[in-house]
Amino acid sequence: MEEKVVDRRVRKTKRQLRLALMKLMAEKSVKDISVRELAAIADINRGTFYIHYKDVYDLLSSLEDVLADGLVVVCRRHNAKDSEGKTYPYLMELYQYIEQNADLCHVLLGKNGDIAFTDRICHILRDEFLYDFLAYYYPNDPAMLDYFCSFIVSGNMSLALTWIDGGMKQTAEEMAVLAGEIIMHGVKVLETKA
């Protein structure tokens, strides 16, 4: 029984620290955040912080792993061969995941996030679903496939961040449809919206 209480306290402390880091990263770069500042916002002492994390970067890494691992799960649920050439189910789940983790995405992938982490996310999106999907349905030119994958992944990252920064007025479903239309029809999407 006592162990559950400790586990709950540990979870609560870690949650407070994650929220404190997200709050601070919304305002400034992680390199400008001190353990003292984090502990004050999380309402814990510095010693408690060091029980759980080596430093601010260790805490940041744990947050990044949570987001990245969740994206891997989303991507792996969608097999290119079983998708019948349709990206909507994948995009739908991807944008739902982004919606559910909007604060985390905003902080980790936004202006104060780490570019290396953004690259990691791009590689996950590319390598865990998109490349196989495009190679299976459009196998003609591997070099063009690489360019197209890079374009789609970067575009979707930017689209998601623009959506988050704009207050997420559209639903995840609407964003998935928009992303799919842009991927499949490019600039023609603007012609139909005008």
Q: Where are the language model's segments positioned?
A:
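Hydrophobic alpha-helical connector segments
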Residues: 75-103
